[in-house]
A protein has these predicted regions:
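A cross-family phosphate/adenosyl-ligand binding-site feature
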Residues: 1-118, 123-187
């Protein structure tokens, strides 16, 4: 079974995301996909090159990084499921509004044409603000499944939401059966 693993630019979560990628690589063939931000931005959490290399080492293939590289995902039915982890607020907005102008959003659009699941692991500082509407739109869409999420710092960042990445494998399994894992909201 082949699973796409798309990464957006919520760099602070990479230390939690890469171990889950490693766990999934033991059971699935993973096709890594990097957003433009993930592909190019160096941050205090590491360089773009280091992140690309780590994904390559885990998955055994270099991440796809362009619209042209990901567009065949749908027509060639390359994936059984697509994970977006972390899924930043900008990508949430684009998915909610049907905008496919990055490698990750085009991968989702192309993959969804086959009626197969997209698993979203949200990570955004405005999840209970501007991004809340976009999360709501995606929650009711067919073939969209969310990794359970909650506030990561209710006092310091009261609108921030982040997925519990350790629940990504069980969310993927449920999504492949057409089910949303519960509970979705973590307290």
């Amino acid at each position: 079974m082949t699973v796409g693993f798309a990464m957006c630019g919520s760099f602070c979560t990479y230390s939690a995301v890469f171990p889950v990628m490693e766990e999934l690589a033991a059971s699935y063939d993973l096709l890594p996909i990097f957003s433009p931000a993930a592909s190019t931005i160096h941050s205090r959490f590491g360089t773009a090159g280091a992140h690309i290399q780590r994904a390559t080492d885990i998955c055994g293939v270099t991440p796809l990084r362009t619209i042209q590289e990901v567009e065949p995902i749908g027509p060639k039915k390359l994936l059984d499921a697509l994970i977006i982890a972390p899924c930043a607020g900008n990508t949430l907005a684009k998915l909610a509004h049907g905008i496919a102008d990055t490698s990750v959003t085009m991968a989702a659009k192309s993959h969804l044409r086959n009626g197969r699941p997209v698993i979203i692991a949200v990570s955004t500082n405005d999840g209970l603000a501007a991004a809340a509407e976009n999360i709501g739109r995606l929650l009711v869409r067919k073939n969209h499944y969310f990794v359970p999420f909650g506030q990561d710092d209710a006092i310091g960042k009261p609108t921030s939401l982040v997925a519990d990445f350790s629940r990504l494998p069980m969310t993927l399994e449920a999504a492949l059966e057409g089910r949303q894992i519960q509970p979705l909201l973590l307290g």
